[in-house]
């Protein structure tokens, strides 16, 4: 099995840079798995988990909370560009749970006030918090 280079880039810089045998991401069209030699493409990512099976240890999987963005597959180089991304080991679950509660309160307030913009922001914040909790518990 071949290997790929996987990089995740955010406005804060490179958040992840490793060799991988397999990558799984959530795109707007559904889940997409990528192996070495995959057809070149660019796809839009949803808020979701990114699974990276490393080449240095067949059983080692890195989980990353990705908050949307794009993925580019070009030969055996995978680049993800996202507003933010956080590895499983770096997630503070209690902080993410507090963010979830805050987003739920904001969503309820927005629905009561019938404020669509506020509701959309709260919904995204809730999705991000849930994603971070899910990834942090792997």
Swiss-Prot record:
**Which InterPro entries does the protein's record reference?**
ATP_synth_F1_dsu/esu (IPR001469), ATP_synth_F1_dsu/esu_N (IPR020546), ATP_synth_F1_esu_C (IPR020547), ATPsynth_dsu/esu_N (IPR036771)
Source taxon at top rank: Bacteria
**Membrane topology designation:** Peripheral membrane protein
Which GO molecular-function terms appear in the entry? ATP binding; proton-transporting ATP synthase activity, rotational mechanism
Provide this UniProt record's keywords sorted from A to Z. Answer: ATP synthesis, Cell membrane, CF(1), Hydrogen ion transport, Ion transport, Membrane, Transport
Localization (cell): Cell membrane
Q: Which CDD domains match?
A: F1-ATPase_delta (cd12152)
Q: What is annotated about its quaternary structure and interactions?
A: F-type ATPases have 2 components, CF(1) - the catalytic core - and CF(0) - the membrane proton channel. CF(1) has five subunits: alpha(3), beta(3), gamma(1), delta(1), epsilon(1). CF(0) has three main subunits: a, b and c.
Protein function: Produces ATP from ADP in the presence of a proton gradient across the membrane.
Identify the PANTHER family for this entry.
Answer: ATP SYNTHASE DELTA/EPSILON CHAIN, ATP SYNTHASE EPSILON CHAIN, CHLOROPLASTIC
Q: Which HAMAP family match?
A: ATP_synth_epsil_bac
What protein does this entry describe?
A: ATP synthase epsilon chain
Organism the protein comes from: Streptococcus suis (strain 05ZYH33)
